[in-house]
């Protein structure tokens, strides 16, 4: 499904609600790394494509979900931002911009939807173990003329725990935010990043 197609997203939610009997939780977890290049070399098509996947899809899913969440008497929305949406990320301007925007979107809709008992939060993961971070490492290494291992070691060294995040740490926080234990948490951006202190400079002088 094209997550940037408003009509397709709306139809998907209508079908899902019909099949499941309602909707009380939305987790926006679609994303794309986008191009790895200096800002002056990023094409407009690349910028728009990255925004469509990372930001517009989140907006459209929220827009489609809200009527169903209201009908249910409330619920929880959790969107995936990134540590890049907190520190920035050299050579990844479209991705970082989209992830910063998700924080702003989350805080705005939390203000709008709180009266409907719909809580809206986002998670800002650091490097999460898995195939996706491996592709990010490979792209960054190629752009900087370095080995994959050196990039991986550098990224791990930027965390106080000196390790990447297990995927189960992300899912555990989602479960918490969507449960009654998270009932008073709204409009927040929560970091799960092994104590990340920043992505650092793009290159060493």
Where is each model-derived feature located?
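C-terminal helical subdomain
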Residues: 122, 145-185, 192-194
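Short C-terminal tail/terminal secondary-structure segment
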Residues: 33-36, 87, 175, 186-205
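The beta1-alpha1 cofactor-binding region of Rossmann-like NAD(H)/NADP(H)-dependent oxidoreductases
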Residues: 1-12, 44, 168
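Substrate-binding pocket helix/loop in short-chain dehydrogenase/reductase
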Residues: 37-39, 43-48, 155
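Active-site helix of classical SDR
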Residues: 62, 98, 106
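Short, small/polar-rich loop/turn modules that mediate ligand/substrate recognition or access, typified
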Residues: 114, 119, 185-187
């Amino acid at each position: 499904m094209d997550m940037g197609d408003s009509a397709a997203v709306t139809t998907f939610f209508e079908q899902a609600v019909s099949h499941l009997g309602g909707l009380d939780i939305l987790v926006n977890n679609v994303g794309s790394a986008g191009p790895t290049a200096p800002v002056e070399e990023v094409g407009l098509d690349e910028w728009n494509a990255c925004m469509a996947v990372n930001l517009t899809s989140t907006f459209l899913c929220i827009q489609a979900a809200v009527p169903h969440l209201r009908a249910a008497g409330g619920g929880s929305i959790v969107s995936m931002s990134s540590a890049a949406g907190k520190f920035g990320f050299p050579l990844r301007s479209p991705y970082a911009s989209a992830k910063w925007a998700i924080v702003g979107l989350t805080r705005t809709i939390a203000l709008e939807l709180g009266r409907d008992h719909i809580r809206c939060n986002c998670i800002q993961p650091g490097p999460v173990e898995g195939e996706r971070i491996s592709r990010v490492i490979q792209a960054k290494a190629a752009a900087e003329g370095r080995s994959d291992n050196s990039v991986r070691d550098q990224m791990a060294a930027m965390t106080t725990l000196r390790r990447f995040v297990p995927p189960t740490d992300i899912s555990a926080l989602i479960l918490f935010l969507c449960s009654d234990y998270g009932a008073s948490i709204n409009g927040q951006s929560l970091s799960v990043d092994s104590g990340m202190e920043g992505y650092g400079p793009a290159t060493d002088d």
